[in-house]
């Protein structure tokens, strides 16, 4: 979740900042000078939308290191560190990707993979994960993160986010133009965008951005199922990944009901924004997988 949450927040911030800068540079005035130029607006929205997503992707690795306090390791330290690096290398070779950077950070059980390119990524695990799981479970979690890299999930999410951003920028400015035109309908001397346009577009950039995040989060949840399956393939069996998920969920595999029903850890709006499916659904998907 940390990996995608950082990406989404960075992306939203970049889009809002770019929108404000565009207003200050007079781009909005150009678009509305003689009525709204939809063709120019669509091009502007595309550049803004994908620009924000690509900048977020390129910044994802350094931001993740900084925000999580990741300490990069090379396997020359403790025996545990050497094992982590060897495990990442083994899975990277199996998956056909370049060796990622490997790091450790302080905190509760967690792990993430990030980076703009498959051959220049980062896999980081927390001290809580190393202390609270068996080696086999940690190995499964590492396999899950390597699978994210091999599947190209960060690039895929960037493309999806770029499309969402484009719609957000386009719609917010069309609605902003309509609101501004209505507010100044009796002002014959008005020219260019007014305060109604600027306020509406900034507010809608934020509101529609959060709504778009629901769609991005849905796609992210589907990628998690694929990464779980990828970890099982790298491990050669499903049980280690099932055990790791059960450990993360605070339950022992033997205590799981035979017919797991799909139920969310958090209901309502929280589940819509969640980048990960409920643990129970992920375990059930692995248990029901063929092969």
Curated annotation (Swiss-Prot):
It is found in: Cell inner membrane. It is a multi-pass membrane protein. The active site is at residue 145. The keyword Transmembrane applies. GO terms for molecular function: metalloendopeptidase activity; zinc ion binding. It comes from the Bacteria. Binds 1 zinc ion per subunit. Its EC number is 3.4.24.-. CDD domains: M48B_HtpX_like. Its main location: membrane. Keywords: Cell inner membrane, Cell membrane, Hydrolase, Membrane, Metal-binding, Metalloprotease, Protease, Transmembrane, Transmembrane helix, Zinc. Its cofactor is Zn(2+). The chain crosses the membrane at residues 4-24, 38-58, 159-179, 199-219. GO terms for cellular component: plasma membrane. GO terms for biological process: proteolysis. Zn(2+) binds at residues 144, 148, 224. InterPro entries: HtpX_protease, Pept_M48_protease_HtpX, Peptidase_M48. Belongs to the peptidase M48B family. This is Protease HtpX homolog. It comes from Paracidovorax citrulli (strain AAC00-1) (Acidovorax citrulli). The gene is htpX.
